[in-house]
Curated annotation (Swiss-Prot):
This is Phosphatidylinositol N-acetylglucosaminyltransferase subunit H. InterPro entries: GPI-GlcNAc_Trfase_PIG-H_dom (IPR019328), PIG-H (IPR044215). The gene is PIGH. GO terms for biological process: GPI anchor biosynthetic process. The keyword Transport does not apply. It comes from Bos taurus (Bovine).
Length: 188
């Protein structure tokens, strides 16, 4: 079963939340951000090239134009490959663990897997960001030395920055699966 909702991020931008329900013990959430627009790419490219052309007319050095083209292309490729994330996915399987995947605009994917035995809880935390209080979903990892301690806090959906209503929906589903996993591990 799959459903999709249109939501917004903390700045008012559009987000799409795709929820795929595979079984009571397996659930996937995918937050999709809008793709980069051709208009913004064109505006940045034209601005850099016009500035370079202005410098070229003053200095009459053709290396300025070549450098502007080269820097623009490298900057665009770097932005698409390392910065612009198209969608983030959270896959929860109660017997295995939690997998987080970030898919960049260039097609590159970054995946992190956390074993369920290391997961203490999934919570909604708050932070101050740019003079605002924002909420984010994070995974608390168990401390191997101290049984009731927390060794690490792993944030989820860092790039999309969804609003609280989206986080609550994902949080409740995560808690259902964690409760299902705890019930399965304690039963004989």
């Amino acid at each position: 079963m799959e459903d999709e909702r249109s939501l917004s991020d903390i700045c008012g931008g559009r987000l799409a939340l795709h929820r795929r329900y595979y079984s009571p013990s397996c659930l996937e959430f995918c937050l999709s951000c809008p793709r980069i627009s051709l208009r913004s790419i064109t505006a940045v490219t034209c601005t850099v090239w016009l500035a370079a052309y202005g410098l070229f007319t003053l200095c009459e050095n053709s290396m300025i134009l070549s450098a502007a083209i080269f820097i623009t292309l490298l900057g665009l490729l770097g932005y698409l490959h390392f910065v612009k994330i198209d969608h983030e996915t959270l896959l929860i399987i109660d017997s295995l663990g939690i997998q987080m995947t970030s898919s960049y605009a260039s097609g590159k994917e970054s995946t992190t897997f956390i074993e369920m035995g290391k997961v203490k809880d999934v919570i909604i935390n708050e932070a101050i960001y740019m003079q605002k209080v924002i909420y984010y979903l994070c995974i608390l990892l168990k401390d191997p030395v101290e049984p009731h301690g927390i060794s690490q806090v792993v944030p989820i959906f860092q790039s999309a920055k969804p609003r609280l209503d989206c986080l609550i929906e994902v949080y409740r589903s995560c808690q259902e699966i964690l409760a299902h996993q705890k019930a399965a591990s304690t039963s004989p």
